[in-house]
A protein has these predicted regions:
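Positively charged n-region of N-terminal signal peptides that target proteins for export
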Residues: 3-9
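Sec-dependent N-terminal signal peptides
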Residues: 9-18
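C-terminal motif of bacterial Sec signal peptides marking the signal peptidase cleavage site
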Residues: 21-24
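N-terminal ligand-binding lobe of clamshell/alpha-beta domains
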Residues: 26-424
C-alpha cells in the first residue's frame, strides 16, 4: 500500500512539473516581453540573459494557504534569431514550500504555448557538465562537488577533475566524476547512471535538439554565454550559474547561506573592476602594436570579427587589429590570401595550438609557406599557447581581465607584467 501511495504522489508531482515544460515558443516574443512580473535583476553587459526574481508577498503569496511562493525566472534569448527565446528556466527551491510553488505555477500556466521551459529544483547537487570553462567556474564558486560527470575529459585542464575522474568505479570514493565521453555524442547510459539534476552544455545554431538527452527529462541548461559579444557580458552569466548551485561544506542550512549566488556576484564585481582598470590604463598609452590571431585551418583562416569578444578585447587593449572596422560579432572565414593581403605588415602573431612542443618557424612553413610573408613571422614576433597543458579556455572564458592583460602586454610591452598564457 505504501508503495502505491508513493507512486501516486510521484505521478502527481511529475504531472505538476510537466505542466511547466511546454515545448512551443510563441514567435516574435522577446525575452524581456515574455518575462513575468517580478524583480528584474540588472544585467550591465549580458544581452542574452534576463533574470527575474519572484517572492514579493503581494505578488506570489497565497493568504489562504499561508504560502509565500519563491522562485526565479531565467530567460535566455535566442542568439541566432533576434526577438525570440532559446529557453526559459524556473528555479524553485527544494523542499515542501518549493513543491507548493511547482503546483501553483502549474495551475497558473496550464494553458497557452510558451517557450521551452524547464523547472530546476535548487540547489542542484548532481550535474553533468559538458563544458570545461563551466567546470572551472564551479570550482571558483565553491560548488565543485556538484560536478558528477563531464564530457571531453582529455581536454579539461583542471587537476582535481582528472583526479576525481580516476576514482570512477570506486564505490568507496567520495564524489567521483564520471567520464561521459564526447560532448558531441555523450554516453547516455553513463549519464543515466549519474542521476543528474541538470545537464550543462553549449547550444548550437540549428542543432535540432539534443537527441537522447532530451528524452531523459532532465533540465538541460543551454549555456549560451559564449555567444555574448561583450567579454564582460559572458562573465556576467556567472550570476545565473551561481543561483543553480550551493556551496560545498557545512554551511548553515539557509537559502542564502548555501547558495553560490553571493560568491558569483562578488567574483563578477572583482572581475569587472579589474577589467575596467586595465582598459583605462591601456587607453592612456599611444595606440599599440597590431595583432593577428589564429592560424590557417585547411584552406580557411578563421579570425575574430571586429565586434566579437576577441575583437573587443583587442580594442580595449588599445591594440591595432586589421579587422577592427568589421561589424561581425562572430568569426570571419577568410582565405589565407585575404589575410596576407590585409595583414602582411602585422607586428604580432598570436595563436593557440593543442599538444606537443611549440611550433618552430620551420614547422609553420611546412604547414603553409605563405606565413613567411607576415612581418611578425620574419621578426620572430610569434606567440603561442598550448591549450593541452595551459588552462587557457578554462580561465579566460569567465575571466576576460586575464586575456585583456595578455593582449595589453603583446601590444604595449611588459610594463603590465609577464605573459601568463602566451609564450614567444
Amino acid at each position: 500500500i505504501f508503495c502505491k501511495i508513493m507512486k501516486k504522489l510521484y505521478i502527481l508531482l511529475c504531472g505538476a512539473t510537466a505542466a511547466l515544460l511546454m515545448a512551443a515558443c510563441q514567435g516574435g516574443k522577446t525575452a524581456a516581453a515574455d518575462a513575468e512580473a517580478g524583480d528584474t535583476l540588472e544585467m550591465k553587459y549580458a544581452k542574452l540573459l534576463t533574470i527575474v526574481k519572484h517572492g514579493d508577498v503581494e505578488e506570489t503569496s497565497d493568504a489562504a494557504e499561508g504560502v509565500d511562493y519563491q522562485y526565479t525566472e531565467a530567460i535566455i534569448a535566442n542568439p541566432w534569431k533576434a526577438g525570440t527565446m532559446l529557453h526559459r528556466y524556473i528555479l524553485i527551491p527544494k523542499g515542501e514550500e518549493g513543491d507548493k510553488t511547482v503546483a501553483m505555477l502549474a495551475r497558473r500556466h496550464s494553458t497557452g504555448a510558451r517557450c521551452t521551459t524547464d523547472t530546476v529544483r535548487t540547489p542542484v547537487e548532481r550535474s553533468a557538465v559538458f563544458i570545461a570553462p563551466h567546470c572551472q567556474l564551479m570550482y571558483e564558486m565553491g560548488c565543485q562537488q556538484a560536478i558528477r560527470g563531464v564530457c571531453d575529459l582529455d581536454y579539461i585542464n583542471i587537476p582535481d577533475v582528472k583526479k576525481r575522474a580516476a576514482l570512477s568505479g570506486n564505490t568507496s570514493a567520495q564524489n567521483p566524476i564520471e567520464d561521459c565521453g564526447s560532448s558531441m555524442a555523450p554516453d547516455i547510459e553513463r549519464i543515466i547512471a549519474l542521476n543528474p539534476e541538470a545537464i550543462l552544455l553549449s547550444p548550437f545554431e540549428n542543432s535540432g535538439g539534443y537527441g537522447k538527452l532530451d528524452k531523459l527529462h532532465v533540465p538541460i541548461i543551454e549555456a549560451a554565454d559564449y555567444m555574448e559579444s561583450s567579454p564582460l557580458g559572458r562573465a556576467e552569466w556567472m550570476k545565473f550559474y551561481g543561483m543553480l548551485f550551493k556551496k560545498d561544506g557545512n554551511a548553515p542550512k539557509t537559502a542564502l547561506a548555501v547558495s553560490c549566488e553571493p560568491k558569483a556576484d562578488s567574483l563578477f564585481a572583482k572581475i569587472e573592476k579589474e577589467y575596467l582598470k586595465l582598459k583605462a590604463e591601456a587607453a592612456g598609452y599611444p595606440k599599440g602594436l597590431s595583432i593577428l590571431t589564429e592560424r590557417k585551418t585547411g584552406n580557411v583562416w578563421y579570425v575574430p570579427g571586429g565586434q566579437s569578444t576577441i575583437g573587443i578585447l583587442l580594442e580595449d587593449a588599445n591594440a591595432r587589429y586589421i579587422f577592427e572596422d568589421d561589424e561581425h560579432s562572430g568569426s570571419l572565414a577568410m582565405s589565407p590570401e585575404q589575410i596576407l593581403a590585409k595583414g602582411k605588415q602585422v607586428d604580432v602573431w598570436a595563436f593557440k595550438y593543442f599538444g606537443g612542443a611549440p611550433l618552430s618557424q620551420t614547422q609553420l612553413l611546412q604547414e603553409y609557406d605563405g606565413y613567411k610573408a607576415l612581418a611578425a613571422f620574419s621578426r620572430g614576433n610569434i606567440y603561442q599557447v598550448d591549450t593541452s597543458t595551459v588552462p587557457y579556455f578554462e580561465l579566460t572564458s569567465f575571466h576576460p581581465e586575464l586575456l585583456l592583460r595578455e593582449f595589453i602586454i603583446l601590444a604595449h610591452g611588459e610594463r603590465f607584467g609577464k605573459l601568463r598564457f602566451y609564450k614567444k
